[in-house]
Amino acid sequence: MAKYIFITGGVLSSLGKGITSASIASILEEMGYRVTLQKLDPYLNVDAGTMSPYQHGEVYVTEDGAETDLDLGHYERFTNAVMTRDNNVTAGRIYYNVISKERKGDYLGATVQVIPHITEEIKESIKRVEKDNDIVIVEIGGTVGDIEGLPFLEAVRQLSLELGRKNSMFIHLTYVPYIKAAGELKTKPTQHSVKELRAIGIQPDMIICRADRELPKGIKSKIALFTNVKEEAVISAPDLEFSYEVPLKLKEQGIDRIITERLNLEHREVNLGKWKKIVNVLRNPEEEVNVALVGKYVELKDSYKSVIEALIHGGIANKVKVNVILKNSEQLDISELQEDIHGIMVPGGFGERGIRGKIEALNFGRENNIPTFGICLGMQLMAIEFARNVLGFSNANSTEFDPDTPFPVIDIMEEQKKVDKLGGTMRLGAYPCKVKENTLAHRIYQKDLIYERHRHRYEFNNRYRKDFESKGVVFSGTSPDDKLVEIMELKNHMWYLGCQFHPEFKSKPFAPHPLFRDFIRACLEYKRKFT
């Protein structure tokens, strides 16, 4: 039977429960334990697929095609665990399942209630990820005290009781504000947050305190006294320059030993050498490169979380600092790309808004031999830009933006034409891609067949393949049956590549994705040669 760690949050949201959970998992993994993580989201959406990036940040796609919370990206980046649709459970899915069972008569006429029916469904969803794992870390989204989170807290309270004290523990992440006028850290919000948690029936075994500085011993002692937690289990989590420092900071305070003792696990040697190397490169880069990320959701950086992290990973591989400069495609002045920019990134997205600026950025990158990388919609816009400005198809477009375009170089996939629902209906998850020899893509991957994650409805229109190839475009990656274009690149360009898939979802700091690694290498080469 697996051991369970339940992680809750208090005082306010966006404290970093996802990174904290992932960091704890990485430490336990380094001890040789098989660890998985799960995110419980109390919102009523069935999944994150139809949510606005402004509301919720990016949608993270798993190998099996689930559209999930961005925290699953942290889980995969920090650990070796592979997430599936079972690793993200929403209140929407729980209620949907319960109501479906009621309609089928599975409850035999019983009055369906939050307790026991909703809580039992939550518990079953949690236990589903236990298979073949020694430890399951469950992050409960939201903040203690939120109405929508109560059934989830009740469910984990019940589950903890069923598992027994040696098989489960609670970690509460809270916030300790520094009041400038008073010149001191205040523990009262943490005290009240734990009081709220205890009123539900949950006593935390550890409190991780987020603050803008280190917690002095006196503050730790005070929190321990008023929350009924051992002082050694009050962990300081100050603001850090890099998120990849968090495992080191937690290990420094003995979190590994506290957890193994509490869960009656064998304590094993923890070697965080790989994290130290990563942090050392981030702190002491040999050079810097500037990459312009041109998108329409740039006001919220989390909208492009995995892309930004993957660019940083590419920097780690090349021992350079990557300055990701966010450019709003709706307000883009092309002269901004002339100012010390060494690479252009156009990530995925949906809808017509902001398209003009992205196409202008791609045109600038192509004509000025600047390393340029397009992902998903970014690749599709590369095709549109090329059709308009090189092939002379002035009205070329995607049928997503102009259903009546005379040159539909991007068209809806055949199997998508009869789909009338948005949620979970795209081409989602990992699919194979055949890589053509003697191409940039093959040099980067060093493989003939790769598997990458997808999230799209539209594709390159094969009717125009010969037109593109006649002018120097190479379709270096396709589906194994050669029907779907996966990668396109330019022959006579330093580095101009677009991919239909999302490579950012398979990049880790200690295993950077090959495309991002080589893109940053090209940016560095461009900087050395031309600036």
From Swiss-Prot:
List of residues binding CTP: S13, D146, I147, E148, K186, T187, K188, P189, T190, Q191, K222
This protein's pathway: Pyrimidine metabolism; CTP biosynthesis via de novo pathway; CTP from UDP: step 2/2
Subunit structure of this chain's protein: Homotetramer.
Biological function: Catalyzes the ATP-dependent amination of UTP to CTP with either L-glutamine or ammonia as the source of nitrogen. Regulates intracellular CTP levels through interactions with the four ribonucleotide triphosphates.
GO molecular function annotations of the record: ATP binding; CTP synthase activity; glutaminase activity; identical protein binding; metal ion binding
SUPFAM superfamilies in the cross-refs: Class I glutamine amidotransferase-like (SSF52317), P-loop containing nucleoside triphosphate hydrolases (SSF52540)
UniProtKB keywords: ATP-binding, Glutamine amidotransferase, Ligase, Magnesium, Metal-binding, Nucleotide-binding, Pyrimidine biosynthesis
Something else known: CTPSs have evolved a hybrid strategy for distinguishing between UTP and CTP. The overlapping regions of the product feedback inhibitory and substrate sites recognize a common feature in both compounds, the triphosphate moiety. To differentiate isosteric substrate and product pyrimidine rings, an additional pocket far from the expected kinase/ligase catalytic site, specifically recognizes the cytosine and ribose portions of the product inhibitor.
Residues that, per the record, bind Mg(2+): D71, E139
Reaction catalyzed: UTP + L-glutamine + ATP + H2O = CTP + L-glutamate + ADP + phosphate + 2 H(+); L-glutamine + H2O = L-glutamate + NH4(+); UTP + NH4(+) + ATP = CTP + ADP + phosphate + 2 H(+)
GO terms under biological process: 'de novo' CTP biosynthetic process; CTP biosynthetic process; pyrimidine nucleobase biosynthetic process
Descriptive protein name: CTP synthase
Renumbered residue ranges of the record's region Amidoligase domain: 1-265
InterPro entries on file: Class_I_gatase-like, CTP_synthase, CTP_synthase_N, GATASE, GATase1_CTP_Synthase, P-loop_NTPase
Active-site residue list: C376, H502, E504
Record-listed E.C. numbers: 6.3.4.2
Binding-site positions, L-glutamine: Y54, G349, L377, G378, M379, Q380, E400, R457
Domain Glutamine amidotransferase type-1: 290-529
Naturally occurring in which organism (per UniProt): Aquifex aeolicus (strain VF5)
Cellular component annotations (GO), alphabetically ordered: cytosol
Binding site for ATP: S14, L15, G16, K17, G18, I19, D71
Family: Belongs to the CTP synthase family.
UniProt-listed Gene3D superfamilies: 3.40.50.880, P-loop containing nucleotide triphosphate hydrolases
